[in-house]
């Protein structure tokens, strides 16, 4: 496995691999890898592609009072996990390599990034789409793999690829969970044992919401309020949002029909966790 810090080196290696007839797969990450990331690699390897993993904690997607400075970083640990999973190349640039001067150009997807995490974290998705578009230009992959725990992000990236005519297939990979149901996240390490136990209410509430839906409940507002009540009764978590949206365009829905997703964001102490469940209406 190769570790590159420079854009030029990545481009040279990718060009060489293409010359040998190989396709290129990109797995973008911010590092501190867990099984969710490694599942993306597993999916990427199925096509026989040369697998590039980016590990870059992108400052543009963090707000002024967020956790950029303390976001976990451990390249040695990540390199071992990545190599064991079959990654061919890690691209781990410094901030100065990705943004060598004041960044005057940004990529932003309107509408899809205005709600949910976009409303709670202004500028977040502009930072995401800017860095992902840069990675797409640098690596020029045939396919890129994203986890669907960040379902809103996945839809935004798909829209960006469509609108900007990137010749890239975006592949969404289902949420990977711990044995007890907690969605895997690099931020889970911030949780105290008590907070982690409380955080299991996210998966429980999504499961209950599915039960209510299967029993015939179709009012989005009713399900949202029942989820909030459950979270408040069973944890000390501070709810950021509980919303049911169209899984196609993120529009609010009143009556559940078609494909929807239930999106949650809850803060346990200083740690903000997200989770979701996609359902097919009748």
Curated annotation (Swiss-Prot):
Residues noted as binding (R)-pantoate in the record, renumbered to the chain: 61, 153
Annotated active site: 37
Main location: cytoplasm
UniProt xrefs under InterPro entries: Cyt_trans-like, Pantoate_ligase, Pantoate_ligase_C, Rossmann-like_a/b/a_fold
Binding site for beta-alanine: 61
GO CC, any one term: cytosol
Miscellaneous: The reaction proceeds by a bi uni uni bi ping pong mechanism.
Name listed for the protein in its UniProt record: Pantothenate synthetase
Gene (name only): panC
């Amino acid at each position: 496995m190769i570790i590159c810090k420079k854009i030029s080196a990545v481009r040279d290696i990718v060009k060489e691999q293409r010359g040998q007839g190989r396709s290129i797969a990109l797995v973008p990450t911010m590092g501190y890898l867990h099984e969710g990331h490694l599942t993306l690699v597993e999916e990427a390897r199925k096509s026989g592609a040369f697998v590039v993993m980016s590990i870059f904690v992108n400052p543009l997607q963090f707000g002024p009072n967020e956790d950029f400075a303390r976001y976990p970083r451990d390249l040695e640990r990540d390199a071992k996990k990545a190599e064991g999973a079959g990654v061919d190349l890690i691209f781990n640039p410094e901030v100065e390599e990705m943004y060598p001067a004041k960044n005057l150009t940004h990529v932003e997807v309107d509408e899809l990034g205005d709600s949910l995490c976009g409303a709670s974290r202004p500028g977040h998705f502009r930072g995401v789409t800017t860095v992902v578009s840069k990675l797409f230009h640098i690596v020029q992959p045939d396919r890129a793999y994203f986890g669907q725990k960040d379902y809103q992000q996945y839809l935004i990236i798909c829209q960006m690829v469509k609108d900007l005519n990137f010749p890239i297939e975006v592949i969404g990979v289902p949420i990977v969970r711990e044995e007890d149901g907690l969605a895997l996240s690099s931020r889970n390490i911030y949780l105290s044992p008590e907070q982690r136990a409380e955080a299991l209410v996210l998966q429980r509430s999504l499961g209950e919401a599915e039960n209510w839906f299967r029993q015939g409940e179709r009012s989005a507002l009713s399900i949202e309020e029942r989820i909030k009540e459950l979270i408040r009764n069973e944890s000390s978590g501070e709810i950021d949002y509980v919303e049911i949206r169209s899984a196609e365009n993120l529009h609010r829905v009143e009556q559940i029909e078609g494909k929807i997703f239930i999106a949650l964001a809850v803060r346990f102490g200083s740690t903000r966790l997200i989770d979701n469940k996609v359902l097919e209406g009748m």
